[in-house]
């Protein structure tokens, strides 16, 4: 469940900025039909930053209910306060989520020892499997391979989502981690195939929101070692990988999902604003290049 194409699911909202349950069900059904390995609910792409604590929990619980056991659900539980991250994580004990994705603390920029103690405390507060999430471009905080290796020794820390785009990190982590069951996942669609060729086991993907079957196929080709065919597919998807970040994620991917009829609205809460017209043209061209339009 922690390998293959895992979607970093967008959170559909109605015109008032409330969760659009009908569109959420539509998205989940789409991923079930497409063979997506798992859903990450309320991560960065799910707009965790603009949902309050209770709303965050509610979206994950609605996702669990609508998934109804058809696809595993991973809860995003990151916070830049250790106590808040523990509280959020513990809300999902015995709910049916299969694990938690926890981002490094953002803005306060802890030292490596602080990162170790932060994730250790969270892991020790629950039996739920934990996926570390390193995305320094968002957080201003880079969790280095030696720290990841220390954390990998903790029983229920089972994986890391590496979103630096730095492919050398794969081998650096592999050399330092002596547990062959510890899973490396790419958090960067554009370098995801190369990441898997170096030993990664999948991608937690933004692109999968709108190209679910294609990302499932890409990860399957990588798992089979068929990188020649994988590169042909990835070349077609590359404009999407790149241009879904033409403006801040998840602005472009929400517009694309609406454009493809996967959900009713591309509403976001401030300070996130709608996709601009020039960016719409760029994303539209990427959708056409990928064969989605």
Curated annotation (Swiss-Prot):
MF terms in GO: 4-hydroxy-tetrahydrodipicolinate synthase activity
SMART domains per UniProt: DHDPS (SM01130)
Entry GO terms, CC: cytosol
Enzyme class: lyase
One GO-annotated biological process of the protein: lysine biosynthetic process via diaminopimelate
Residues engaged in binding pyruvate: 45, 204
Lyase is among the record's keywords: yes
Superkingdom of this protein's organism: Bacteria
Cellular localization per UniProt: Cytoplasm
Record EC number: 4.3.3.7
Keywords: Amino-acid biosynthesis, Cytoplasm, Diaminopimelate biosynthesis, Lyase, Lysine biosynthesis, Schiff base
Catalytic activity: L-aspartate 4-semialdehyde + pyruvate = (2S,4S)-4-hydroxy-2,3,4,5-tetrahydrodipicolinate + H2O + H(+)
Pathway noted in the entry: Amino-acid biosynthesis; L-lysine biosynthesis via DAP pathway; (S)-tetrahydrodipicolinate from L-aspartate: step 3/4
Similarity remark: Belongs to the DapA family.
Role noted for this protein: Catalyzes the condensation of (S)-aspartate-beta-semialdehyde [(S)-ASA] and pyruvate to 4-hydroxy-tetrahydrodipicolinate (HTPA).
Subunit note: Homotetramer; dimer of dimers.
Annotated protein name in UniProt: 4-hydroxy-tetrahydrodipicolinate synthase
Organism: Yersinia pestis
Gene assigned in the entry: dapA
């Amino acid at each position: 469940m922690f390998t293959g194409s895992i979607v970093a699911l967008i959170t559909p909202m109605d015109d008032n900025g409330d969760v659009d349950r009908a569109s959420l069900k539509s998205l989940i059904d789409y991923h079930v039909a497409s063979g997506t390995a798992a859903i990450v609910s309320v991560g960065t792409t799910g707009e965790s930053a603009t949902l309050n604590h209770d709303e965050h929990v509610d979206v994950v619980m609605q996702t669990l209910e609508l998934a109804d056991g058809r696809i595993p659900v991973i809860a995003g539980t990151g916070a830049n306060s250790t106590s808040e991250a523990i509280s959020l994580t513990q809300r999902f004990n015995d709910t049916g989520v299969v694990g938690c994705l926890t981002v490094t603390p953002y803005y306060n920029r802890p030292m490596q020892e602080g990162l170790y103690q932060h994730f250790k405390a969270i892991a020790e507060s629950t039996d739920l499997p934990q996926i570390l999430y390193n995305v320094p471009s968002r957080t201003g905080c880079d969790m280095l391979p030696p720290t990841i290796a220390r954390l990998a020794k903790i029983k229920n820390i089972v994986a890391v989502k590496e979103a630096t785009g730095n492919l050398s990190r794969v081998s650096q982590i592999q050399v330092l981690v002596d547990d062959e069951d510890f899973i490396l996942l790419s958090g960067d669609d554009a370098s995801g195939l190369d990441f898997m060729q170096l030993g990664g086991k999948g991608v937690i993907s933004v692109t999968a929101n709108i190209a679910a079957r294609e990302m499932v196929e890409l990860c399957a080709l990588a798992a089979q070692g068929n990188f020649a065919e994988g590169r042909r597919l990835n070349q077609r998807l590359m404009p999407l990988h790149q241009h879904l970040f033409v403006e801040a994620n998840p602005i472009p991917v929400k517009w694309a999902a609406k454009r493809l009829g996967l959900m009713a609205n591309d509403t976001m809460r401030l300070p996130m604003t709608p996709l601009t017209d020039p960016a719409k043209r760029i994303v539209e061209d990427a959708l056409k290049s990928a064969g989605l339009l």
